[in-house]
Amino acid sequence: MSDVAARLETIRAAHLYRRLRTLSTPQDREVVIDGRRVLLFSSNSYLGLGINAHIRRSAVRALEKFGTGAGGSRLVTGNMTPHMQLESALAAFKGSESALAFTSGYTANMGVISALCHKDTVIFSDALNHASIIDGCRLARGRTVVYAHNDMDDLLEKIRQLRPRQGFIITDGVFSMDGDLARLPELAHIARSYGLTLMVDDAHATGVLGATGRGTLEHFGLSHEDVPVVTGTLSKAIPSEGGFVCGSEILCELLRNTARPFIFTTAPSPAAVAAATAGIGHIAAHPGLVRRLQDNVAYFTGSLAEQGMHVPGQSPIIPIMAGEEEKAVRAAEALLALGVFAPCIRYPTVPRGQARLRLTVMASHTRDDLDHAAVSLRKALAGV
């Protein structure tokens, strides 16, 4: 422990030091941070459902009926009626035969990958995959081969070099720091052609992409035959906490018996599970909310273009590149001074020299909010 102070000083000197900012209000388009009311442009609550009255009442009813905690792992005493209801809702919403809930999206990816991949498995993983996929690959006993981001030629070259007897292609559906989409139809074709299994993390696509918010499969017109393993989270557009995997019943049966993060973790609380189920139901019943989010994304990218910033706008995640860490820190502080909260993203979340402001659009943002954020962003960047 003698080097703790020195390590912290090194972090500060590299402009990588992080501190916690405290929100004293719910996640909405406006929040109070450290005592100041600002526009929120960095939340993953894409549909703004964290304040939805029906969803909150569902959580309260579950709390009153089932108590504050599950009291054990799902395989011992922690499997309650709300957990089974959630998995049924997930399977119906995602169009899969079955589903299995985890305590987080992180543990879902780690559990699924480490359970399915053995010593003879080759995993082909996109270079910009989320840390939970990277850590799941590290836990797995197979060989991990990283291919260049969304580069099908590089992926094919690596597959042809190795010719694995059993292999997985694993990718984010929406890449969390860049906001671009995986080339899923091409990945599905490659997986079929070479006898590989395609796994997609739909954390930032569920409730966001597709005509009804069912994710990347709906967006691209694919099925679970094309993508047999779909993971995701319950803490973004779905306004709760937890994670999931959707697939065949036999897949979920195997994971119930072999996925260590599922077996050795206390089950999610009944209130959180009930909130997730209610959130899924609300999204399914209100596709107009998903369209509103998609319309806001299109409007915001247009507003940014008017301010001289051209971004793809494939998803609600809008990265504005700053480059050096110090510049990103100054830009984020300048933006906050103008009433817009969008923290900078730095190493190790992104590579060194690729620091950025990561803005996210919500369905609850107004056009005035979006215009104000675009103008404020131009001013903040001009000052650094």
Swiss-Prot record:
Residue positions where N6-(pyridoxal phosphate)lysine is found in the record: K236
Annotated binding of substrate, by residue: R18, H130, T349
Catalyzed reactions: 6-carboxyhexanoyl-[ACP] + L-alanine + H(+) = (8S)-8-amino-7-oxononanoate + holo-[ACP] + CO2
Cofactors demanded by this protein: pyridoxal 5'-phosphate
PANTHER family: CLASS II AMINOTRANSFERASE/8-AMINO-7-OXONONANOATE SYNTHASE (PTHR13693)
UniProt record similarity statement: Belongs to the class-II pyridoxal-phosphate-dependent aminotransferase family. BioF subfamily.
Source organism, top-level taxon: Bacteria
Pfam families on file: Aminotran_1_2 (PF00155)
Enzyme Commission code(s) on record: 2.3.1.47
Keywords: Biotin biosynthesis, Pyridoxal phosphate, Transferase
GO biological process: biotin biosynthetic process
Protein name: Putative 8-amino-7-oxononanoate synthase
Natural source organism: Desulfovibrio desulfuricans (strain ATCC 27774 / DSM 6949 / MB)
Binding site residues for pyridoxal 5'-phosphate: G105, Y106, S176, D201, D202, A203, H204, T233, L234, S235, K236
One example GO MF annotation: pyridoxal phosphate binding
Subunit note: Homodimer.
Gene3D superfamilies: Aspartate Aminotransferase, domain 1, Type I PLP-dependent aspartate aminotransferase-like (Major domain)
Pathway involvement of the protein, from the record: Cofactor biosynthesis; biotin biosynthesis
InterPro entries: Aminotransferase_I/II_large (IPR004839), AON_synthase_class-II (IPR050087), AONS_Archaea/Proteobacteria (IPR004723), PyrdxlP-dep_Trfase (IPR015424), PyrdxlP-dep_Trfase_major (IPR015421), PyrdxlP-dep_Trfase_small (IPR015422)
Known function: Catalyzes the decarboxylative condensation of pimeloyl-[acyl-carrier protein] and L-alanine to produce 8-amino-7-oxononanoate (AON), [acyl-carrier protein], and carbon dioxide.
